[in-house]
């Protein structure tokens, strides 16, 4: 007999329409409304990438692809999909409540972020678990999947494809910039958080498995809190690498993200490219994982480790 269990896929969330932006930004800021200038700055960024982020649709497609792949991988279990978002509806708590209403008493949770931090993946899991405890739902949490061979294979293939478009004699003048979303430095250090080390391990694995010669690690998209965040920022790193090594090609792999959204389309494709153009060097950014079977397969393999 097939058993039905829940699959809770959690993600950051993004505004569905322009009128959602203020409430969304306020939620990110823990209930503190943005100033008019701050709100306009965010609206301008969205306009620059085409109006709104494609994240909402991509999250749904990724979640559906994962559900389908899991239902193919397991013979005796049927996974029922629920999507819970951090900063906009359907919120994480809404998804767990829907599970309860559907009679789900067991579920697997996964966040669409490959590296673990207590301030990112950990906070999603805590919110989900707190709500699940109200209803007696048992959760198995996926904490990370950056180390899964299929995840590394995806990025290795994309790096090698990008290198293939660069003349062979310029490979030694090419650098791979491996990055993830920055987080407050003090909190990371105080809690001995594994997040920076997980990015470092990812960079090492990509260096080992791909044809790239030079690799650098950076952070991006830091918040404006007035306190130090993990660095170096990828923009500062780009200038420093050029000044020291005179690299001619920069390949940006924002491996902490799993699809194209504001942080990639603006922070990489605009801000980093502006610096590359200013320096007279070539900007490259391989395709993000989205619903690629290797990426989805990496999460499936990690779920097999917990359920």
UniProtKB/Swiss-Prot annotation:
Pathway: Porphyrin-containing compound metabolism; protoheme biosynthesis
Family annotation (InterPro entries): Ferrochelatase (IPR001015), Ferrochelatase_AS (IPR019772), Ferrochelatase_C (IPR033644), Ferrochelatase_N (IPR033659)
Compartments it resides in: Cytoplasm
Main location per the UniProt record: cytoplasm
Domain of life assignment: Bacteria
PROSITE patterns reported for this sequence: FERROCHELATASE
Enzyme Commission code(s) on record: 4.99.1.9
Catalytic activity: Fe-coproporphyrin III + 2 H(+) = coproporphyrin III + Fe(2+)
Keywords, comma-separated and alphabetical: Cytoplasm, Heme biosynthesis, Iron, Lyase, Metal-binding, Porphyrin biosynthesis
One Pfam short name: Ferrochelatase
Binding site for Fe(2+): 181, 263
A GO molecular function held by the record: metal ion binding
GO CC annotations on file: cytoplasm
GO biological process: heme biosynthetic process
Binding-site list for Fe-coproporphyrin III: 12, 29, 45-46, 53, 124
Function: Involved in coproporphyrin-dependent heme b biosynthesis. Catalyzes the insertion of ferrous iron into coproporphyrin III to form Fe-coproporphyrin III.
Family: Belongs to the ferrochelatase family.
Protein name: Coproporphyrin III ferrochelatase
Species: Staphylococcus saprophyticus subsp. saprophyticus (strain ATCC 15305 / DSM 20229 / NCIMB 8711 / NCTC 7292 / S-41)
Name of the gene this protein is made from: cpfC
């Amino acid at each position: 007999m097939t058993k039905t269990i829940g699959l809770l896929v959690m993600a950051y969330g993004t505004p569905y329409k322009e009128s959602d932006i203020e409430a969304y930004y306020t939620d990110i800021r823990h209930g503190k409304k943005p100033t008019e200038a701050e709100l306009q700055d965010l609206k301008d960024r969205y306009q620059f990438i085409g109006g709104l982020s494609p994240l909402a649709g991509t999250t749904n497609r990724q979640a559906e692809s994962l559900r389908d792949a899991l239902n193919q991988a397991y013979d005796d279990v049927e996974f029922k999909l629920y999507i819970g978002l951090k900063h906009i509806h359907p919120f994480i708590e809404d998804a767990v409540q829907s599970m309860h209403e559907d009679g789900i008493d067991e579920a697997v949770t996964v966040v669409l972020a490959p590296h673990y931090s207590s301030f990112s993946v950990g906070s999603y899991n805590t919110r989900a678990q707190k709500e699940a405890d109200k209803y007696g739902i048992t959760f198995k949490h996926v904490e990370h999947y950056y180390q899964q061979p299929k995840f590394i294979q995806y990025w290795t293939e994309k790096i090698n494809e990008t290198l293939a478009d660069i003349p062979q004699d310029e490979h030694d003048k090419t650098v791979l910039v491996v990055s993830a979303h920055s987080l407050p430095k003090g909190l990371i250090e105080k809690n001995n958080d594994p997040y920076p080390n997980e990015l470092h391990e990812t960079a090492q694995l990509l260096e080992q498995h791909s044809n790239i010669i030079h690799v650098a690690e950076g952070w991006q998209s830091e918040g404006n809190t007035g306190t130090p965040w993990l660095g170096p920022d990828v923009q500062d790193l780009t200038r420093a690498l050029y000044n020291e090594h005179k690299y001619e090609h920069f390949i940006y792999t924002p491996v902490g993200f799993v699809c194209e959204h504001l942080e990639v389309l603006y922070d990489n494709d605009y801000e980093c490219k502006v610096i590359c153009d200013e320096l007279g060097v070539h900007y490259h950014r391989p395709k993000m994982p989205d619903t690629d079977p290797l990426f989805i397969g990496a999460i499936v393999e990690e779920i097999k480790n917990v359920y």
